Structures are given as C-alpha cells and as structure tokens.
C-alpha cells in the first residue's frame, strides 16, 4: 500500500511550509496510485523535482498548470486535469501528517552513517 507519508523521504519537503507539504503529499500519493494503475515507474508519472515545485508554488488554475506541463520536459502533459484535481483535493488524514524538518533528515543520515 506504499508509504503513508512519502513526503518525509524527499529532501525538498523540509523547505516547504505546512500547506506546501500537504500539497506535496497529495501529489506523491496521486503519483503512487497512477504508477500502480499504469504499471509504470513513479518518476515516469511525475518526478520529484516537478512535484516539489508544484507543491511550493501551485499554479493559479488548470490552464496555468497545463501551460507549465507543456513547457516542462518529461512532464505528464496528458494528466494535467487529474494532476490539478490531486493538487486541489485535501486528503482525509492531512491533519495527522508529520512535517518534514531538516533536523529529522540530518538525524536519519547520521544514523545511516553510524551503521556503515
């Protein structure tokens, strides 16, 4: 069923405000579902960089999103409407979402280094 909080694994998430992290979580969960249903790698659906950029600065409307997708290499142009819907629709468990913080990622990296 995938990771419940996939945004915590993304380095860029720590630089987003809580609303941005919620948008990123929506996009990553949508991407996971799309990848599973189409049997494609997640990065083919929506790469981490574009997901983070959309979460940081969400487009004003569906046309602005489509224009951005049309001008971005490897963007999911044909999925613009579904991507817009995913970006806009709050998740039922967003209120329980832990926030990505720089110190958490640093602790995780330190633990990994100590194990090696």
Q: What is the predicted role of each segment?
A:
Residues 1-116:
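Accessory DNA-binding and partner-docking regions appended to nucleic-acid-acting proteins
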């Amino acid at each position: 069923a995938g990771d419940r909080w996939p945004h915590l694994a993304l380095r860029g998430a720590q630089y987003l405000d809580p609303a941005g992290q919620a948008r990123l979580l929506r996009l990553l969960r949508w991407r996971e579902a799309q990848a599973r249903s189409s049997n494609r790698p997640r990065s083919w659906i929506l790469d981490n960089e574009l997901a983070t950029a959309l979460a940081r600065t969400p487009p004003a409307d569906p046309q602005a999103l489509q224009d951005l997708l049309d001008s971005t290499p490897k963007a999911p142009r044909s999925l613009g409407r579904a991507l817009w819907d995913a970006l806009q629709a709050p998740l039922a468990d967003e209120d329980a979402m832990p926030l990505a913080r720089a110190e958490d990622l640093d602790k995780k990296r330190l633990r990994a280094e100590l194990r090696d």
